[in-house]
Amino acid sequence: MSFVPEKVFFTKGVGRHKEYLSSFELALRDAKIEKCNLVTVSSIFPPKCERLSVEEGLKRLSPGEITFAVMARNSTNEHNRLIASSIGVALPADESLYGYLSEHHPYGQTSEQSGEYAEDLAATMLATTLGIEFDPNKDWDEREGIYKMSGKIINSFNITQSAEGEDGLWTTVIACAVLLP
């Protein structure tokens, strides 16, 4: 049996609680996907996969459903510790080809830094599979221009959640690409 997702939506959340597991549950609730049995998968954006809004995607989920997702997750119980979770996305111009989703879960990076890193990672993985020549030592903005000017990569973006740890609590952040039939 083959299952290639045809739809995807992106969501994120943050949770805080005195218990580690409960902070994760609250992050799932914030992302509105707590009712699913999540199965994490690796990072391929399926060919011809349609992006849905969070609201449209949630309508397709049922409580207890086995749900596939690419998830970036990070937690801390350190006061003022900055954490982030990002999903980077890179899509080919040719929709019959697959794209990439990357997960990044750093400490000490802002949302912008984490998101840019994840997006860069996804775009670089896609560029190497498409045979786009580039200098990996150039900064992201320059490589992004090369990738898009090649005509082979049409879009890249990220979804990121960051937060600072609070005294006496676990803080968990998640970013997810939820894959649907």
Curated annotation (Swiss-Prot):
Pyruvic acid (Ser) PTM positions: 43
Co-factor binding details: Binds 1 pyruvoyl group covalently per subunit.
SUPFAM superfamilies: Pyruvoyl-dependent histidine and arginine decarboxylases
InterPro entries from the UniProt entry: Pyr-dep_his/arg-deCO2ase (IPR016104), Pyr-dep_his/arg-deCO2ase_sand (IPR016105), Pyruvoyl-dep_arg_deCO2ase (IPR002724)
Lineage: superkingdom: Bacteria
Cofactors demanded by this protein: pyruvate
GO molecular function: arginine decarboxylase activity
Entries under HAMAP family matching the protein: PvlArgDC
NCBIfam families: pyruvoyl-dependent arginine decarboxylase
Official protein name in the record: Probable pyruvoyl-dependent arginine decarboxylase
